[in-house]
């Protein structure tokens, strides 16, 4: 059995299970982005940041709280994430059977991964943090419900590649007949003032909400948004 060991544990998130849970509880207590007034019957996916938990937790925790409230918990999370290292293939699923970090071992859904029929690459995922940092949040909100992951590392992120990966996910979901949730890992704007970052990000979010794939790409390119 092949295991991918954590690469940013102790830096991007705490190095022990107890400290991870303590940090999540503290973020919940601060309630920067309350979800109590939000309504959602079914959540199919989301965009989550991959910065350290002291930053990203204030967006990620409310998302998982909302999933928890629906009571419709996925069996598999497909995590689409960038490639910061430049290593590996343009598009790749990890070939490990388990991802290990401070919250324990999380299995990969190899049935779903194989049905997606994308290339496998250990190197694409070995030192990449953008999927790893999301996983420690999951156990707190899954109510003991078993879950697995399919990390998909996307070095290329053009509309054609995005459409191709989406088609592969749709095909695989129909084939394996599982409850799947798709998570896209992105920090959106970097190194800008809050007001400027919010303004630029909103241009892209508006196109996402319209489900306008070319519009998303155009907004990113024309406004030089770091997504």
Please name every model-derived segment.
Residues 1-227:
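Active-site histidine-anchored catalytic micro-motif
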């Amino acid at each position: 059995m092949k295991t991918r060991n954590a690469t940013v544990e102790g830096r991007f998130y705490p190095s022990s299970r107890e400290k991870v849970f303590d940090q999540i509880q503290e973020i919940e207590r601060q309630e920067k982005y309350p979800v109590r007034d939000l309504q959602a019957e079914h959540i199919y996916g989301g965009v989550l940041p991959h910065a350290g938990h002291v930053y990203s937790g204030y967006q990620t925790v409310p998302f998982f709280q909302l999933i928890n409230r629906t009571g419709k918990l996925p069996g598999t999370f497909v995590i689409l994430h960038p490639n910061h290292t430049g290593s590996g293939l343009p598009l790749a699923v990890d070939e490990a059977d388990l991802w290990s970090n401070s919250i324990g071992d999380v299995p990969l859904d190899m049935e779903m991964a194989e049905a997606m029929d994308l290339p496998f690459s250990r190197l694409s995922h070995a030192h990449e943090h953008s999927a790893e940092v999301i996983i420690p949040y999951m156990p707190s909100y899954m109510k003991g419900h078993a879950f697995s992951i399919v990390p998909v590392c996307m070095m290329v992120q053009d509309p054609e590649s995005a459409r191709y990966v989406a088609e592969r996910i749709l095909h695989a979901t129909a084939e394996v007949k599982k409850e799947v949730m798709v998570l896209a890992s992105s920090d959106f704007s970097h190194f800008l003032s809050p007001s400027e970052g919010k303004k630029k990000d909103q241009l892209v979010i508006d196109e996402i909400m319209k489900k306008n794939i070319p519009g998303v790409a155009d907004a990113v390119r024309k406004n030089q948004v770091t997504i």
